Amino acid sequence: MKARLLILLCALSATDADTICIGYHANNSTDTVDTVLEKNVTVTHSVNLLEDSHNGKLCRLKGIAPLQLGKCNIAGWILGNPECESLLSNRSWSYIAETPNSENGICYPGDFADYEELREQLSSVSSFERFEIFPKESSWPKHNITRGVTVACSHAKKSSFYKNLLWLTEANGLYPSLSKSYVNDREKEVLVLWGVHHPSNIEDQRTLYRKENAYVSVVSSNYNRRFTPEIAERPKVRGQPGRMNYYWTLLEPGDKIIFEANGNLIAPWYAFALSRGPGSGIITSNASMDECDTKCQTPQGAINSSLPFQNIHPVTIGECPKYVRSTKLRMVTGLRNIPSIQSRGLFGAIAGFIEGGWTGMVDGWYGYHHQNEQGSGYAADQKSTQNAINGITNKVNSVIEKMNTQFTAVGKEFNKLEKRMENLNKKVDDGFLDIWTYNAELLVLLENERTLDFHDSNVKNLYEKVKNQLRNNAKEIGNGCFEFYHKCDNECMESVKNGTYDYPKYSEESKLNRAKIDGVKLESMGVYQILAIYSTVASSLVLLVSLGAISFWMCSNGSLQCRICI
């Protein structure tokens, strides 16, 4: 019996067998990603695809400064509002920045025809040449060119008028009919502006133009309109009971424009030869100008990013990421990050059979941990790690390249009477934006799922590689580990890792040790059976003796009466 118990104790005190385990990298990363099936999966490495930061400033775009209108809007700038005169010296810009509530626009009250279309045209212009289309001193010898000023357009507390237009009035009691033409010989589109004055009463009409019935005619190859003054009493705006309506047209190279009038003409003085640029645009922003450069400008501020998506603003100018409504777009490049819990061993659950990663393995994604008489240590499997890195890097670069179509996205212009069209356009834009956002999020979810499955597969493949080499020279003990039936020194361990393990060399030793272990198991089973029988008999005897003692005690004090009948 003593011999059997000694064998049992020897079997229970396990020997320090040589082992090798397959595992994967873990670290202290807190990055989380979403997949199709899971949310907030902690991973070792990931890349962000969504830019959400900006500098809050207006910057030069590719080294070219913007045209910052300040207190002026597009109308005030292009007509030449006296308060905007300083802007007329600008000849080129990267984009135009307008404030939301600019003060200086049309100074003499009236309507600007097709103003939203003009803004749209100017949004693609990156430079222009301002020139006298009809020189002031020589073009109107029979009309007064100095009296046409108004307090509504005052500057430095003096009455003034637009710097690109001339208000022609009677001279010496006459307003002769006029006819002026211009041929565009500049090989560029030319923007021509003019106006028509509508007095509030017939007396003003006679005083300014010496006739009650007047007209203005403007004709080109693509434009043909005749205007008549609308004389009517109106409420004063900026102290003026009269109105001026403003008009514009684009004159193609070689085209001719003809002005005819016998009164009420606000004549062109300066025109603009336009040069269009693909990266220009108009933004409405309260951001201030700063000494900075950027490739992408938004109304909120400049973005300096090579990421494919941004959630800062839908209006962008330059080479900009695509706007989406997402709050998180992070693509996994590493593995699930599940550092092993020491009380549960070295591993946790990846690949379905390993329960955690190794923070001690820092030079690769997948690898080995071995233990033998010479010590223990971690070693990465460089080949499988490098193949995985190359594959995932190529995939991430491909996704970014395909989705990173950088472009300018400017807002569309609608006037107050086009509210239904504006609302419809907003719904269409929102629909496209929802589709873009959905596509971006779905792409990231699918790729994250595939990447984690890819890592899972690589760990399994590494495990199978070791298993196929060792065959029955070692046994699987769970958690991705194998216990050798033979002594495996460092040279032996290295051969397992690099795939050159010599199975026949160790098979005889393994066979003998396997037989010994199996014998110990059988002997242990016999000992366990003897102990079980002994324990059962001893327990039964103790129970019977206890019952007898209790019965004797109860009979002696009368609590239990015993009758024996024959």
UniProtKB/Swiss-Prot annotation:
Residues in the Extracellular compartment per record: 18-529
GO biological process terms held by the UniProt record: clathrin-dependent endocytosis of virus by host cell; fusion of virus membrane with host endosome membrane; fusion of virus membrane with host plasma membrane; viral budding from plasma membrane; virion attachment to host cell
HAMAP family: INFV_HEMA (MF_04072)
Signal sequence segment: 1-17
Lineage per the UniProt record: Viruses, Riboviria, Orthornavirae, Negarnaviricota, Polyploviricotina
Record SUPFAM superfamilies: Influenza hemagglutinin (stalk), Viral protein domain
Post-translational modification: Palmitoylated. In natural infection, inactive HA is matured into HA1 and HA2 outside the cell by one or more trypsin-like, arginine-specific endoprotease secreted by the bronchial epithelial cells. One identified protease that may be involved in this process is secreted in lungs by club cells.
Pfam families per UniProt: Hemagglutinin
Leftover remarks: Major glycoprotein, comprises over 80% of the envelope proteins present in virus particle.
Subcellular location as annotated: Virion membrane; Host apical cell membrane
Domain of life where this protein originates: Viruses
Residues carrying covalently attached carbohydrate according to the record: 27-28, 40, 90, 144, 286, 304, 498
InterPro entries linked: Capsid_hemagglutn (IPR008980), Hemagglutn_HA1_a/b_dom_sf (IPR013828), Hemagglutn_influenz_A (IPR000149), Hemagglutn_influenz_A/B (IPR001364)
Gene Ontology CC annotations of this record: host cell plasma membrane; membrane; viral envelope; virion membrane
Transmembrane spans: 530-550
Site (Cleavage): 344-345
Gene behind this protein: HA
GO molecular function: host cell surface receptor binding
Keywords attached to this entry: Clathrin- and caveolin-independent endocytosis of virus by host, Clathrin-mediated endocytosis of virus by host, Disulfide bond, Fusion of virus membrane with host endosomal membrane, Fusion of virus membrane with host membrane, Glycoprotein, Hemagglutinin, Host cell membrane, Host membrane, Host-virus interaction, Lipoprotein, Membrane, Palmitate, Signal, Transmembrane, Transmembrane helix, Viral attachment to host cell, Viral envelope protein, Viral penetration into host cytoplasm, Virion, Virus endocytosis by host, Virus entry into host cell
Task of the protein: Binds to sialic acid-containing receptors on the cell surface, bringing about the attachment of the virus particle to the cell. This attachment induces virion internalization either through clathrin-dependent endocytosis or through clathrin- and caveolin-independent pathway. Plays a major role in the determination of host range restriction and virulence. Class I viral fusion protein. Responsible for penetration of the virus into the cell cytoplasm by mediating the fusion of the membrane of the endocytosed virus particle with the endosomal membrane.
Protein name: Hemagglutinin
